[in-house]
Amino acid sequence: MKGVPRTVAVVGVPGTGKTTVCRILSGMVRHTYINYGELMLRVAGEWNLAETLEDLFKLPMDQQHLIWLEAAHRIRRLDYVLMDLHGLDRSPLGYLISLPVDIISPDIIVILESDPQSILWRRMADSKMRVRESLESLREHMEMLRTSMFVCSAVLGSVVSIVENHDPEEAALDILGIIEAAWAGDTTP
């Protein structure tokens, strides 16, 4: 790949620090920063279906899916996008890939990871965090996210990178380095 990557998807399990890292990164790149969940909430609000994330996730799955599709179509119309999303969500029925690969084809998929224990601590400290998992189920979720993003990458022809989030500033710089390497066409390990 050579040239500025048009779409960069930063994915990770809830509590891994995606939003913090993406907000820092958005000040370093020309891409428009989009938090997928916030965009879905905006769409739901415009359609008079939900005003809070809690309301959004109480909607029937078919309505959530329509909102998810509308958000994807809005993102697809943008030129340079930095997307912040989970990539894989856990539901009562199992896992759902939340990267809309039929509509958006990221040039780069960055899987942001943190130590699972740190993620659990962040989740407990965040009163808005609705996801509750055991350490074992969190590790499974992280592994399933990796697997699903590599499958998406194979289907889309995207590059996948894994970045550890020990420090948000450093993680943002690591992702910036990946974007710059793609821009330069550098695919050497």
Curated annotation (Swiss-Prot):
InterPro entries to which the protein is assigned, alphabetical: P-loop_NTPase
Residues noted as binding ATP in the record, renumbered to the chain: G12, V13, P14, G15, T16, G17, K18, T19, T20
Molecular-function annotations in GO: ATP binding; kinase activity
Domain of life assignment: Archaea
Record carries keyword Transferase: yes
Keywords of this entry: ATP-binding, Kinase, Nucleotide-binding, Transferase
Homology family: Belongs to the archaeal adenylate kinase family.
Protein name as annotated: Adenylate kinase homolog MTH_1663
Organism: Methanothermobacter thermautotrophicus (strain ATCC 29096 / DSM 1053 / JCM 10044 / NBRC 100330 / Delta H)
